[in-house]
Regions:
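Long, contiguous all-alpha helical interaction modules
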Residues: 1-157, 161, 167, 314, ...
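Domain-exit/linker segments immediately C-terminal to small folded modules
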Residues: 214-389
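Basic, glycine-/proline-tolerant helical and adjacent loop/strand elements
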Residues: 121-295
Length: 549
């Protein structure tokens, strides 16, 4: 049975405003995972446990704030007013740090705020010429995030990139408005605050009170819905939402435009759906500390994902690897059931929730993701492959559409894309068969396409690999002509669908002698005659032609 707030060996007194009894000593309050309404609340419960443990290492902390009981189902917190204030002082700790701006800062009335000072630096313009540029120095509030900093352990002398990513997210997404930054700002400016004590009073007197639920604490919340309904929560549940940002890993989705340039598009926030609180608390620090701090652009390389949902797969893989090392290969239930991935991005002064995706934690899916992530180099190829993992689709699914809609410079003419197609169709995705086993449709298509390209290379240009030898000029000519033939066929296939594609495949790609064997011919013919298989063969054909490009 779930407990509510209760006094622990405490005298009581009444508040001036009403008949609420206020304990003078600590209260004990318990939460169980099963009663909490969302993954954010459950993550908040885990964050509470880790923050209280971290607070116990601070000798300056005052009052009582301790975990009285912690098990798989939940925890009990014993805390008094001073202890709660110390806890809030920890999670909202901040400092004033000098930051340089390339333009003067303006207040809400569009008035220029005088800087502390200005400095000049030599910078290069687009033409490479140096010129002097003025920078304006202001004191800025920076969230400390000491718990996150404790998990971020780069090599000596290098920046804590994961901490910076967390700070940027807090400031640009969760606390993008000045009014929402007050808990941090007041502490950075060393002003007295009573937010912890006030929260404790609410939990001590009326833990089940209804309260508003702003988006500062709950991702996806709105002031009013389209039906003019407001988001509401229970006080004892909303309290937990102060802590989930400490245990929600952050990722940065990257997109590639039609010119091949990469651009970061907001944040992918991974909120864990916890089913074993004690297991989570035991392993979480290890999961966080094992992330690499190698920089890519201005963020950790391990934080970059090709699609927002990939963030959930990456966390699932990391969690399962930690559990696997600790428990061995035995079938151990993970302490995560799944994750909710929130894709958030700034749009002017607003924060947009672009998508929410649920990703279940399954070993086979996590392993398939890790294999794909490691094997492929092209961001476009990798994005489609990982999207198929997320959607539980065959590895080749969607590549026909991708090749048809993406500029050829990023597919058949891109070295990395062609390399990935070759690796996929010869190593990573291919089922290993013996000579006695029938070849799969993927193997038959790859063999037919390669035979066509090499056959046309010989009949049209008189080039054979056996004649190339060690002559570098002949080898280069051979590769150039082979790529030319593959690209021409690629462009012809991508513009054809349905019966038009089938006609091209049989009349052109099969115009050279093929050695597929009777069973292979029958399997390929069945596929081309089945309208449900034609798109599969078309996708595989485009991939096979790229592999030979």
């Amino acid at each position: 049975m779930t407990e509510t707030a209760k006094p622990t060996k405490a005298k009581s007194k009444r508040t001036k405003s009403a008949s609420k009894v206020v304990p003078e000593g600590p209260i004990t309050i318990r939460w169980d995972l099963a009663e909490l309404p969302s993954s954010q609340h459950k993550a908040g419960l885990a964050g509470l446990a880790l923050c209280v443990r971290f607070l116990s290492r601070n000798p300056a902390a005052q009052g009582i704030c301790e975990i009285e009981a912690l098990d798989a189902e939940g925890l009990a917190l014993r805390v008094d007013s001073d202890g709660m204030q110390s806890l809030f002082d920890e999670i909202y700790a901040a400092s004033l740090e000098e930051q340089q701006r390339d333009a003067p800062f303006k207040d809400k009335n569009k008035q220029v705020v005088p800087p502390k000072r200005t400095i000049e630096k030599l910078v290069k313009d687009k033409k490479g010429k140096e010129k002097a540029k003025t920078y304006y120095v202001y004191d800025s509030v920076v969230p400390r995030g000491d718990l996150v900093a404790d998990w971020d352990q780069p090599p000596a002398g290098e920046a804590k990139l994961w901490l910076k990513l967390w700070r940027d997210f807090i400031w640009s997404v969760l606390r993008s408005m000045a009014t929402t930054r007050e808990p941090f700002t007041s502490r950075a400016e060393k002003r007295a605050t009573q937010d912890g004590a006030e929260t404790w009073l609410g939990l001590a007197t009326n833990p089940s009170a209804g309260v508003e639920l702003p988006s500062t604490y709950y991702l996806g919340a709105q002031a009013k819905t389209a039906e003019m309904a407001s988001f509401r929560d229970v006080s004892r549940y909303q309290f937990l939402l102060h802590f989930w940002p400490y245990v929600a890993p952050l990722y940065v989705p990257a997109t590639v435009d039609r010119e091949g340039k990469r651009e970061f598009t907001g944040y992918a926030v991974v909120v864990p759906e916890i089913v074993d609180l004690a297991g989570f608390v035991e392993d979480w620090a290890t999961v966080m500390r094992e992330r690499a701090s190698t920089v890519a652009g201005y963020v950790p390389r391990d934080a970059i994902v090709d699609i927002a949902g990939e963030a959930g797969l990456d966390l699932a893989h990391r969690v399962l690897e930690v559990i696997r090392r600790r428990e061995g290969q035995q079938a151990t239930r993970p302490w995560l059931d799944g994750v909710d991935v929130f894709h958030l991005a700034k749009d002017g002064n607003n924060v947009r929730l672009r998508a929410v995706q649920r990703v279940d934690v399954r070993r086979e899916r996590a392993d398939e993701y890790a294999r794909s992530k490691a094997a492929y180099w092209s961001a476009i190829f990798r994005r489609q492959r990982i999207s198929n993992v997320l959607d539980s689709k065959p590895w080749w699914s969607g590549f026909g559409r991708l090749c048809a809609q993406t500029p050829k410079e990023l597919t058949v003419q891109d070295t990395k894309f062609c390399r990935d197609c070759r690796v996929a169709m010869t190593e990573v995705e291919m089922k290993v068969t013996t000579e006695s086993e029938p070849k799969t449709l993927e193997q038959l298509v790859y063999q037919a396409v390669r035979t066509y390209v090499l056959g046309r290379l010989g009949s049209k240009y008189g080039l054979k690999w056996a004649d190339v030898g060690t002559n570098p000029a002949l080898k280069q000519d051979y590769e150039d002509k082979k790529s030319k033939l593959a690209r021409e066929a690629f462009l012809a296939v991508r513009s054809r669908t349905g019966d038009d594609f089938v006609s091209y495949f049989t009349a052109t790609l099969c115009s050279v002698p093929q050695r597929l064997g009777e069973q292979g011919y029958l399997e390929l013919a069945r596929g081309l005659a089945d309208e449900n298989e034609v798109e599969r063969i078309r996708s595989l054909t485009l991939l096979a032609l790229s592999a030979n490009g």
